[in-house]
């Protein structure tokens, strides 16, 4: 069962990403390290598989960079 967009946003916020707004259903998130990611879709929508992979990849990269 796919995650909801709101769940992806929660994961990003738990990992220190800041919501920088956006147009329409797009939301831009910025991490203090400079990492950027855009999530599209309304909060209750199912996330696309590529969105889930992108968020997991971005969180993993940020966590690895913080360890250095």
Q: What residue ranges belong to the model's regions?
A:
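Polyanion-binding surface elements
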Residues: 1-16
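Hydrophobic aliphatic residue packing
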Residues: 5, 9, 37-39, 55
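C-terminal structural segments of small proteins and small subunits
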Residues: 43-68
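Extended, charge-rich alpha-helical interface modules
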Residues: 14-15, 37, 64-68
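A short, structured beta-strand/loop element
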Residues: 19-45
